[in-house]
C-alpha cells in the first residue's frame, strides 16, 4: 500500500474497468520452399509484395533445374494477386548447395563468401580501392630525433593501435604501424626517416600522416553495397569481419597474418601498390545443388535453437503467421509435420496441396485419408497461370492462391466468413474439371475443389477441414476459434501475478465480455443477443480453493460460431390461381 506520511492531498490513478482487447491477426501467411537466394536458417523473412520477394529471394525458378520444387515464387505471387498483404518466407536448399566465394588470388588472405548458398552468388562482383579514415600532421618529435618513435600530432582521433599508417612528404611514402595512440601522442613501431624533417606546423601542411584502409564495393544485378574505410586490424571497430555483418550479399573472413613490415591492407589483399587504385574480385563455385538430394527432413527442418532453426521449425518463434503452406511439396511426411506444427501451436492453419498426378477421385481420396485434423484443409486441382519466366501457361499448386483468398476474405468480411465462393484472380484454367458427381464424393470427405462456372469465373467451391469430427468440419469455425483464443491470450497478459480474488475475476469477465460482444456485433457469433452468442464463467464455480492456492485462475468461455450456408435449398411447389 502507498505511504501517507506528510499531511496533504494525494491524487492517485488506478485501473478498474475492462482492458481493451485487440483482435489477433489472421491474414498473415507463412511459406516454405526453394528459392534462388535467401537465408536457409534463422527467422523467416517478412515479405510485403512480389517485388519484395524478388529482392530478397530472387525470381522464378526453372523447371529444368528445380522440377516440382520450383513453386514458391509462383505461390507468393498468387498470394499477393489474390489479396494477401503480408507473409513470411523461409527458404529451403538441397544439402549439396554451395555458396559462391572469391576465386581471385586474394582468397588466401581475405575470404569473401556469398551470404547464402546458390549459383546466384557467381554473379556477384566486387572491387576494393585504397581509403583512409583519418589524416593529421606531426607537430613535434619527442626524444632523440634520430631514434624516437613518439610524435605529438594535431589530432590522434581515428588513429588506433595496430593501424597501418602512411607518412607522405615530397620524398614519397613510408609505411609504419601504430603501437600506442592517446591524447594526441602517437608511438610507431619504428622511427620515421627524416628525423625532424617530418614535423610540419603549417596551416596547409605538405607532410601528412594518414591511416591506411580500403573501401569495398559489391555489386549484384541492380543491388550495390559500399563498405567504406575497412581495416585488417582485428582490434579496430572498422575491421572487415565486423563491418561485413551488415552486408546482405557477402560475409568476410580475414585470413591475413601480421607481417614484420607495415603493409597497407590494399596491398596485403591485392598484392598491388596503393597507386594501382583499384582491384577487382571475381566470384565462382556457387551451386544450387541437386533436387535429388532434397529430403522430407530439409522441409521439416531442425530446431537448433534461436536463430539457427530451419524449415518448418523456423516458424516456432513467429507469433504473427496464422496460415501455413509449403507449395507443391506433397510428401505426406512433410505435410503431416506441417499439420502437427499447426496443432501444437494452436494458432495457425495449414493449406495442403494434393499431388498433381492424383486427379482421379480414388487417388485423391487415398491422399486425403492420410490426414485427420481440424487445423488443415486440402485443395484440388492444380491451377493454370501464366509463367513470366518461360512466357507460357503452366500449372501450379493451389495453396498460394488459396492463402491469398483466406487473407482477402479475412480483411474484407472477417474470419467468420468461410473462404469459399471466392473468385481466383490470375488463374486462366484448371488442370482437371470436376463435376457435381465427383464433388459429391470429395466434399463430404473434406477435399475442397476449385471449379469453373460459366459466367462466374473460377471459384473455390469448398470450405471443409480434414477433420472427422463434425464439430470442426468447417474451416471458418476452426479459424474463428483460433482468432478468439489468440486474441484473449494476447490481451490478458496483464492478469498474470495480479491478486487472484473477486475484483480481478470481475475485471477479467468485463474485459472478455466487451471483446466477445464486439465479435458478436461483427457477425462472427450466432444469436440475437450476446447472451445467446456466448457465456463467460469465472469465480468460485470454476475454481476450487486448491486451484487458487496453486495460482490458477480458470475462466470458462463458450461461444456459438456461425456456420456457412453450404447447402442452399429452395423448396418450390405449385400454386393454383384459386389458392
Q: Over which residues does each language-model region extend?
A:
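Short, cationic low-complexity segments
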Residues: 134-136, 236-243, 577-579
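Structured, hydrophobic secondary-structure cores that serve as assembly/anchoring elements
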Residues: 1-118, 166-169, 219-223, 282, ...
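Long, low-complexity, polar/charged, intrinsically disordered or flexibly structured peripheral segments
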Residues: 259-308
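Autoprocessing Asn-cyclization modules and mimics
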Residues: 99-113, 119-195
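Short amphipathic beta-strand/extended segments with alternating polar/hydrophobic composition
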Residues: 100-104, 121-128, 177-179, 223-265, ...
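Small/polar beta-strand repeat architecture
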Residues: 169-248
Amino acid at each position: 500500500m502507498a505511504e501517507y506520511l506528510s499531511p496533504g492531498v494525494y491524487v492517485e490513478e488506478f485501473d478498474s474497468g475492462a482492458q481493451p482487447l485487440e483482435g489477433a491477426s489472421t491474414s498473415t501467411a507463412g511459406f516454405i520452399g526453394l528459392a534462388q537466394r535467401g537465408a536457409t536458417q534463422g527467422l523467416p523473412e517478412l515479405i510485403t509484395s512480389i517485388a519484395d520477394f524478388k529482392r530478397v529471394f530472387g525470381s522464378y525458378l526453372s523447371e529444368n533445374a528445380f522440377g516440382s520444387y520450383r513453386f514458391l515464387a509462383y505461390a507468393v505471387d498468387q498470394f499477393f494477386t489474390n489479396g494477401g498483404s503480408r507473409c513470411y518466407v523461409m527458404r529451403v536448399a538441397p544439402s549439396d548447395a554451395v555458396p559462391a566465394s572469391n576465386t581471385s588470388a586474394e582468397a588466401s588472405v581475405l575470404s569473401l563468401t556469398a551470404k547464402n548458398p546458390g549459383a546466384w552468388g557467381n554473379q556477384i562482383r566486387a572491387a576494393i580501392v585504397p581509403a583512409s579514415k583519418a589524416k593529421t600532421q606531426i607537430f613535434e618529435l619527442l626524444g632523440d630525433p634520430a631514434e624516437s618513435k613518439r610524435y605529438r600530432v594535431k589530432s590522434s582521433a581515428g588513429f588506433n593501435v595496430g593501424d597501418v599508417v602512411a607518412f607522405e612528404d615530397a620524398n614519397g611514402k613510408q609505411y609504419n604501424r601504430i603501437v600506442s595512440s592517446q591524447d594526441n601522442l602517437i608511438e610507431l613501431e619504428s622511427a620515421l626517416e627524416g628525423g625532424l624533417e617530418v614535423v610540419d606546423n603549417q596551416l596547409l601542411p605538405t607532410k601528412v600522416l594518414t591511416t591506411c584502409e580500403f573501401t569495398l564495393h559489391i555489386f549484384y544485378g541492380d543491388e550495390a553495397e559500399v563498405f567504406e574505410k575497412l581495416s585488417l586490424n582485428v582490434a579496430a571497430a572498422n575491421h572487415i569481419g565486423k563491418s561485413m555483418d551488415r552486408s546482405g550479399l557477402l560475409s568476410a573472413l580475414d585470413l591475413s597474418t601480421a607481417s614484420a613490415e607495415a603493409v597497407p591492407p590494399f596491398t596485403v589483399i591485392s598484392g598491388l601498390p596503393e597507386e594501382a587504385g583499384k582491384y577487382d574480385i571475381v566470384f565462382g563455385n556457387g551451386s544450387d545443388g541437386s533436387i535429388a538430394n532434397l529430403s522430407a527432413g530439409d522441409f521439416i527442418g531442425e530446431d537448433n535453437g534461436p536463430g539457427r532453426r530451419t524449415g518448418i521449425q523456423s516458424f516456432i518463434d513467429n507469433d504473427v503467421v496464422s496460415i501455413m503452406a509449403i507449395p507443391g511439396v506433397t510428401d505426406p511426411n512433410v505435410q503431416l509435420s506441417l499439420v502437427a506444427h499447426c496443432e501444437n501451436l494452436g494458432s495457425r492453419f495449414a493449406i495442403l496441396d494434393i499431388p498433381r498426378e492424383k486427379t482421379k477421385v480414388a487417388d485423391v481420396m487415398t491422399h486425403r485419408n492420410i490426414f485427420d485434423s481440424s487445423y488443415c484443409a486440402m485443395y484440388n486441382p492444380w491451377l493454370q497461370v501464366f509463367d513470366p519466366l518461360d512466357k507460357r501457361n503452366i500449372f501450379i499448386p493451389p495453396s498460394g492462391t488459396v492463402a491469398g483468398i483466406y487473407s482477402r476474405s479475412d480483411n474484407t468480411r472477417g474470419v467468420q466468413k468461410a473462404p469459399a465462393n471466392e473468385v481466383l484472380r490470375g488463374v486462366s484454367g484448371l488442370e482437371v474439371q470436376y463435376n457435381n458427381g465427383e464433388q459429391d464424393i470429395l466434399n463430404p470427405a473434406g477435399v475442397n475443389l476449385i471449379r469453373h462456372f460459366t459466367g462466374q469465373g473460377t471459384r473455390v467451391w469448398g470450405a471443409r477441414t480434414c477433420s472427422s469430427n463434425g464439430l470442426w468440419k468447417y474451416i471458418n469455425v476452426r479459424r474463428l476459434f483460433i482468432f478468439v483464443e489468440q486474441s484473449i491470450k494476447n490481451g490478458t497478459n496483464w492478469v498474470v501475478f495480479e491478486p487472484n480474488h473477486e475484483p480481478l475475476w470481475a475485471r477479467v469477465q468485463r474485459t472478455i465480455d466487451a471483446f466477445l460482444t464486439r465479435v458478436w456485433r461483427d457477425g462472427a457469433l450466432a444469436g440475437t443477443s450476446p447472451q445467446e452468442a456466448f457465456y463467460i464463467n469465472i469465480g468460485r464455480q470454476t475454481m476450487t480453493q486448491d486451484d487458487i492456492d496453486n495460482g490458477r485462475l480458470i475462466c470458462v468461455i463458450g461461444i456459438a460460431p456461425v456456420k456457412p450456408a453450404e447447402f442452399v435449398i429452395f423448396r418450390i411447389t405449385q400454386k393454383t390461381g384459386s389458392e
